[in-house]
Amino acid sequence: MQDSSIKLGIVVAEFNYDITHLMLDRAISHAKFLNAEVRAVFKVPGTFEIPLAVKQLLSRDDIDCVVTLGAVIKGETKHDEVIANQVARLVSDLSLEFNKPVSLGIIGPGATHEQAMERIEEYSTRAVESAVKMARRMRSMMEGSSSVNIE
C-alpha cells in the first residue's frame, strides 16, 4: 500500500503572499517528508477562488487528495468570516462529491497578520498530513482492508 505514493494537488491563495508563499514552501517540504508526490500547484488570486481550483484538481485521475492553503486576515468588517466559512463549506462539499480528501490549511478567520505568521508551519504541515493520511486510509479501505484503524 505505502509503496505507491500518494499524489496530491495544492491550491494556494496569492493574497497575503508574504504568508502563503511560506505556507506553500512548508507544505511541499512536508509532502516530500511523507513520501507524497506533489503533482500540481494551483495558485489562485485569493481564498475565495480556492473551491474552483479544488474542483479542477479533484477531477484529475492523477490526484488522490488536495491541500488548500491561504490566510484570511481579520479586517474592520466580518468579510473574513464570510469568506473563510464559505470556502470551508465548499471544499468540504467537493471532497464528498469527488470522494477524495481535501484538507483545510487556511489560517483564519479572525487572525491578525502576526498570528498568521506564527501559524504558517502548523497549518501547512497539518494540512498536508491530514490529506495524505486520509488518502492512504481511503486507499486501504478500497483495497479491501477490514480495519478502520489504518495507519
Swiss-Prot record:
Reactions catalysed, as given in the entry: (2S)-2-hydroxy-3-oxobutyl phosphate + 5-amino-6-(D-ribitylamino)uracil = 6,7-dimethyl-8-(1-D-ribityl)lumazine + phosphate + 2 H2O + H(+)
InterPro entries on file: LS (IPR034964), LS/RS (IPR002180), LS/RS_sf (IPR036467)
EC number assigned by the record: 2.5.1.78
Enzyme class: transferase
Matching Gene3D superfamilies: Lumazine/riboflavin synthase (3.40.50.960)
Record: residues binding (2S)-2-hydroxy-3-oxobutyl phosphate: E76, T77, R119
Pfam families: DMRL_synthase
Function of the protein: Catalyzes the formation of 6,7-dimethyl-8-ribityllumazine by condensation of 5-amino-6-(D-ribitylamino)uracil with 3,4-dihydroxy-2-butanone 4-phosphate. This is the penultimate step in the biosynthesis of riboflavin.
Protein name: 6,7-dimethyl-8-ribityllumazine synthase
